């Protein structure tokens, strides 16, 4: 998934992060109710959010070029 994030612009990454956060919240609610098809999806989404946060922070600090 990281390779696909490298081609995103900063605005695209922030939008994708917001989308993943909403999807993660949905999965959390579904897991409480007990209707989750793939319980490992929650972990994958959480890790993708962390990857995006890292890349966004690198752009803001100037470590990674736009």
UniProtKB/Swiss-Prot annotation:
Q: Would the keyword Ribosomal protein turn up in this protein's UniProt record? A: yes
CDD domains xref list: Ribosomal_L29_HIP (cd00427)
Q: Which family does it belong to?
A: Belongs to the universal ribosomal protein uL29 family.
InterPro entries in UniProt = Ribosomal_uL29 (IPR001854), Ribosomal_uL29_sf (IPR036049)
State the Gene Ontology BP annotations. translation
List the NCBIfam families. Answer: L29
HAMAP family for the chain: Ribosomal_uL29
Per the record, GO CC terms?
ribonucleoprotein complex; ribosome
Q: What is this protein called?
A: Large ribosomal subunit protein uL29
């Amino acid at each position: 998934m990281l390779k696909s994030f490298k081609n995103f612009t900063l605005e695209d990454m922030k939008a994708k992060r917001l989308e993943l956060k909403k999807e993660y919240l949905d999965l959390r609610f579904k897991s409480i109710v007990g209707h989750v098809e793939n319980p490992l999806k929650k972990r994958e989404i959480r890790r993708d959010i962390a990857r995006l946060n890292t890349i966004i922070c690198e752009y803001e600090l100037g470590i990674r070029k736009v």
